[in-house]
């Protein structure tokens, strides 16, 4: 299976506030990083109690893959992330629109196709995974099968952009029942070599067109 590795502009964008809506619905994040090799809070929706107010944290990770060499819609594909430290968050892969070639900026925090403030976006976004990721290895690759929409975009777009987002609170817009440990970590493309880089592994489609020749 060929591999397409994430570009080095991948990374995370975080937002924090004293209210859930203030963190989750920000247009611009409060911090970002597209140069680290790995992070412990790559995807996060957590709450830290405090006085006079608690602090809510939302972190999303963004990736892009050069798919310009994919001519035909793949027969199948998997996105793979090497885990790091915690693995408590339930995750979705969704289509995104962040800039490429300039590094992630805090202004990319809400660059999710179909996303919107103050709403449950599970039905609004373009989902790329076949199923929700509910388990996360912190010492190996986490393999996530991609759906037909992702396969079509691999063939139809020169760059496949996506966001790894927490499902239960962030994507669903639900600030209830949050805790201090709901986050998952992973490695990014800035790690030396490609051993732990995020990647898409895919099965190519063979062109089965049949040509009939004739002598005239």
Label every model-predicted segment:
Residues 2-12, 151-212:
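Proprotein-processing/basic-patch segments
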Residues 215-216:
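Short, solvent-exposed loop/edge segments of extracellular or virion-exposed proteins
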Residues 5, 85-160:
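Beta-strand-rich interaction/scaffold domains
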Residues 57-60, 139, 195:
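Short, solvent-exposed loop/turn segments at the edges of secondary structure
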Residues 1-27:
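Juxtadomain low-complexity/linker regions and immediately adjacent membrane-anchoring helices
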Residues 23-86:
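A short beta-strand-loop element at or near the start of a globular domain
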Residues 51-54, 87-91, 100-103, 167-183:
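Short, surface-exposed beta-strand/loop "edge" segments at domain boundaries and coil↔beta transitions
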Residues 65, 77-79, 93, 144, ...:
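Residue-level detector of buried hydrophobic side-chain packing
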């Amino acid at each position: 299976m060929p591999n397409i590795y994430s570009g080095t502009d991948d990374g995370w964008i975080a937002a924090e506030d004293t209210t859930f809506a203030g963190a989750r619905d920000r247009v611009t994040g409060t911090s970002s990083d597209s140069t680290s090799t790995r992070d412990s809070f790559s995807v996060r929706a957590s709450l830290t109690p405090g006085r006079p107010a608690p602090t809510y944290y939302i972190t999303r990770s963004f990736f892009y893959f050069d798919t310009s060499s994919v001519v035909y819609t793949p027969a199948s594909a998997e996105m793979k992330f090497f885990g790091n430290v915690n693995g408590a968050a339930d995750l979705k892969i969704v289509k995104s629109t962040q800039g490429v070639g300039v590094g992630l900026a805090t202004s990319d925090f809400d660059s999710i196709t179909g996303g919107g403030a103050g709403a449950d976006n599970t039905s609004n976004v373009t989902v790329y995974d076949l199923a929700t990721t509910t388990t996360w290895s912190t010492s190996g690759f986490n393999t996530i099968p991609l759906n037909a929409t992702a396969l079509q975009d691999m063939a139809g777009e020169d760059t496949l952009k996506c966001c790894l987002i927490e499902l239960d609170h962030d994507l669903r817009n639900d600030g209830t029942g949050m805790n201090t440990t709901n986050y998952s970590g992973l490695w990014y493309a800035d790690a030396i070599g490609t051993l732990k880089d995020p990647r898409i592994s895919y099965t190519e489609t063979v062109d089965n067109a049949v040509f009939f020749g004739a002598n005239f």
